[in-house]
C-alpha cells in the first residue's frame, strides 16, 4: 500500500496542511531512523484530507496498511459442522449482524463467528473457505473485544452480509478488499492474558498478522507538536545539561544561569506538551 502513503503526502502538501505535513515528515523520519512505526498511525490526518477533497469513498484505516493482499489457504476448523447457504441462515445472520451494529452484543458476534466457521467448513473453493475463516476470525475478535467496535468494524460487518448474498446466489467471486479489511482488524487483536480464539489464531498464524504491541489508528501519534518548539526544546535541554555537567565539575560560575536555563526548559515542556 505504498502508493496510498505517497498519495497522502502529496495531498497534504497540495492542501497546505502544516499539521498533516508535519505528521508525514515525522513518520518518514522515524522510518529512516529504523523505528518500528506503522503507516496506519497516519490515519487521522489521512481521513481529514479525504474529507477535505470530498472523496466519494470512505477513508478506512486499512487504506494505509502496508500489506499487499494475497489469498492464502486457511483450512476450516476441525470438528465444526458444515453449514449451507439458505434463507433461514441468512435470516439468522441478518439478526446477528444487526445486533452487532447496535453495539455491545458479544453473543451475536460469537454467533456470527460460529456460522462463518460453519460456512467455511462447507466450501470446496479455497478463496471462499478462506474468506469465511477470516470472517469468523473477525467476529471472534468483536465477541471478545480484541479490537475497536466502531464505525469501521460495523461497516465491515454489514459488508459481510452483502458478500454472503452474492455467494449464496452462486457467485464464486470474493471481494479482495473486504477480505483485506477484515484481515486488518484481525491483525489488531492481541490476546492479553487469555488465549486467542481458534479462527483468529489460525488466520493470524497463516497470514503472519500477530503483533507485539497495540496499534491505535484513531489516536494521533504524529504531528502533535510544533517542530520549531521541539527544536528549541532540544537546544534548551542540551544547554541545561552542559551547565549541569560544568557545575558537577566545580565550575561555580555557572550558578547564575542554571536556574534560568532549567526554567526555560520547563517553559518549553509546558508549551510543547
Residue locations for each model-derived region?
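Extended, amphipathic alpha-helices with heptad-repeat/coiled-coil or helix-bundle character
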Residues: 1-11, 15, 19, 107-144, ...
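Structural secondary-structure packing elements that flank or coincide with functional cores
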Residues: 3-83, 145-226
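Secondary-structure edge/capping motif, primarily at the C-terminal ends of alpha-helices
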Residues: 5, 31, 96-104, 123, ...
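Long, amphipathic alpha-helical coiled-coil segments characteristic
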Residues: 60-110, 213-257
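Charge-rich, solvent-exposed alpha-helical interaction surfaces
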Residues: 92, 96, 115, 134-137, ...
Amino acid at each position: 500500500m505504498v502508493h496510498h502513503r505517497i498519495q497522502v503526502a502529496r495531498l497534504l502538501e497540495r492542501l497546505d496542511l502544516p499539521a498533516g505535513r508535519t505528521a508525514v515528515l515525522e513518520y518518514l523520519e522515524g522510518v529512516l531512523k529504523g523505528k518500528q512505526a506503522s503507516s496506519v498511525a497516519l490515519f487521522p490526518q489521512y481521513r481529514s484530507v479525504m474529507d477535505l477533497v470530498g472523496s466519494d469513498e470512505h477513508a478506512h484505516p486499512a487504506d494505509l496498511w502496508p500489506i499487499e493482499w494475497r489469498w492464502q489457504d486457511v483450512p476450516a476448523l476441525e470438528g465444526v459442522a458444515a453449514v449451507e447457504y439458505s434463507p433461514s441462515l441468512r435470516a439468522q445472520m441478518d439478526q446477528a449482524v444487526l445486533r452487532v451494529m447496535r453495539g455491545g452484543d458479544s453473543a451475536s458476534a460469537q454467533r456470527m463467528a460460529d456460522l462463518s466457521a460453519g460456512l467455511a467448513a462447507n466450501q470446496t473453493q479455497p478463496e471462499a473457505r478462506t474468506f469465511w475463516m477470516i470472517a469468523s476470525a473477525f467476529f471472534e475478535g468483536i465477541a471478545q473485544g480484541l479490537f475497536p467496535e466502531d464505525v469501521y468494524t460495523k461497516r465491515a460487518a454489514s459488508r459481510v452480509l452483502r458478500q454472503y448474498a452474492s455467494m449464496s446466489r452462486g457467485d464464486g467471486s470474493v471481494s479482495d478488499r473486504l477480505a483485506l479489511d477484515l484481515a486488518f482488524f484481525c491483525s489488531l487483536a492481541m490476546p492479553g492474558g487469555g488465549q486467542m480464539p481458534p479462527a483468529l489464531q489460525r488466520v493470524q498464524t497463516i497470514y503472519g498478522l500477530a503483533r507485539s504491541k497495540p496499534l491505535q489508528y484513531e489516536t494521533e501519534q504524529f504531528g502533535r507538536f510544533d517542530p520549531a518548539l521541539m527544536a528549541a526544546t532540544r537546544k534548551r535541554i542540551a544547554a541545561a545539561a552542559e551547565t549541569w555537567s560544568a557545575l558537577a565539575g566545580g565550575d561555580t560560575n555557572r550558578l547564575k544561569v542554571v536556574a534560568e536555563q532549567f526554567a526555560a526548559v520547563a517553559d518549553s515542556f509546558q508549551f510543547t506538551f
